[in-house]
A protein has these predicted regions:
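Conserved P-loop NTPase-based nucleic-acid remodeling module centered on helicase motor cores
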Residues: 51-143
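Hydrophobic residues on the short alpha-helix immediately C-terminal to a glycine-rich phosphate/catalytic loop
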Residues: 38-42, 65, 69, 238, ...
Length: 365
């Protein structure tokens, strides 16, 4: 077990609190380490492994959490039956408690979207671009809407329109003036997909909906939730309904799964339970120059006062100040020229190119 003095006062406060805790883990502050420590602490307090549920978003995150928990249990010399560990993704947790053997591939949804777009001539693109770009992005939109529990039988026009508008802000797939028309396409495609699905099986969003409909859902003493910023409304309801006490870790600034319904608004479902709120500020990954620059940048781009406060006091574990980052405003051709010049000077795997949308990747490539 890590010594108390090595954990830090912020983490220790979160670990020692007996009730529900909501941790804002800024990048590089060791959230997986903290979750694993919380698990070990609960076991040391006499909580049985079968009474603790751990939920995360991706299979990779699940494997990492499982690995960290096992390592720290061994380090703490805790004799625990590892077969009793309950570490799941949200979908694997739902599947484990449902008798749903016929899970369909996402390819069916893509096929239905493609056939509809071709038949109705919605876009004037060739097949290659439809298949590689438009269809996957429309699939993301469908998954996003369904993650809010929207189905053809439960279509709320106003709610669906509002969600489409929110999605449009982070995607250039839909022009504002086309939202009404697109809503009609969505309802038609959704209906066709549900009919096809009824013949072939259920999809992953159905797993969550069907799990929530169970009368006798499994109950635990504690639920540990990772990557809270990426949790959608259905997943938030599953986590909060699984135990009275939660230990949730996330960072609104790192929300990346908005297309699947992940929303910083779902933080509110957890804050309504009046947990202890703890902010982690000690960064073990970045230099102080990068932290100062990032804090200043994020503060200039957000109007949410609580999010701004989360950036106060970011401190590097590394004593080296490092090099101050620079922002250069330039046109596309100038940026491409700069990238090409850099590639000739350094190894290509030392350079990262990050853009806002998939269409921008196509332009740069």
């Amino acid at each position: 077990m890590i010594k108390k003095e090595d954990i830090g006062s912020e983490k220790q406060k979160a670990l020692d609190f007996k009730g529900s805790v909501l941790v804002t883990a800024n990048p590089g502050t060791g959230k997986t380490f903290l979750l694993a420590n919380k698990y070990v602490n609960l076991v040391k307090q006499g909580v049985l492994p079968e009474e603790i549920l751990c939920l995360t978003f991706t299979n990779k995150a699940k494997r990492e959490m499982e690995k960290r928990i096992i390592e720290q249990l061994k380090e703490a010399k805790s004799e625990v039956d590892l077969s009793k560990l309950n570490v799941y993704t949200f979908h694997s947790f739902a599947l484990d408690y449902l008798d749903e053997g016929n899970i369909i591939s996402t390819n069916l949804l893509r096929f239905v979207i493609y056939e509809y777009l071709k038949e109705k001539e919605v876009f004037s693109y060739g097949d290659a671009y439809l298949i590689s770009d438009i269809v996957p992005r429309m699939e993301n939109l469908m998954r996003y809407l369904k993650s809010y529990g929207i189905t053809p039988e439960k279509i709320s026009y106003d709610k669906t329109k509002k969600l489409l508008e929110e999605f449009e802000r982070s995607s250039d797939l839909i022009e504002k003036e086309d939202l009404e028309k697109f809503l009609g396409y969505f309802i038609e495609i959704f209906g066709l997909y549900e009919k096809e699905k009824a013949r072939k099986g259920i999809d992953y969003a159905d797993l969550l909906i069907n799990f929530l409909a169970l009368k006798n859902k499994p109950k635990f003493k504690f639920v540990l939730v990772d990557e809270l910023q990426d949790v959608n409304e259905l997943e938030a309801r599953i986590a909060l309904g699984s135990a009275k006490t939660f230990f949730a870790v996330g960072d609104k600034k790192q929300a990346i799964f908005g297309f699947q319904g992940g929303s910083i608004g779902n933080f509110k479902l957890f804050t309504e339970k009046k947990p202890l709120k703890q902010n982690l500020t000690l960064n073990r990954r970045s230099t102080q120059q990068i932290l100062d620059f990032s804090a200043e940048y994020f503060k200039s781009k957000t109007i949410d006062e609580e999010s701004k406060k989360e950036l106060d006091g970011l401190k590097s574990f590394n004593d080296s100040k490092g090099i101050k980052p620079k922002i250069i405003e330039a046109g596309r051709e100038e940026i491409i020229g700069k990238v090409c010049a850099l590639i000739n000077k350094i190894e290509s795997n030392d350079l990262a190119i990050i853009v806002r949308t998939n269409s921008q990747i196509m332009e740069i490539a």
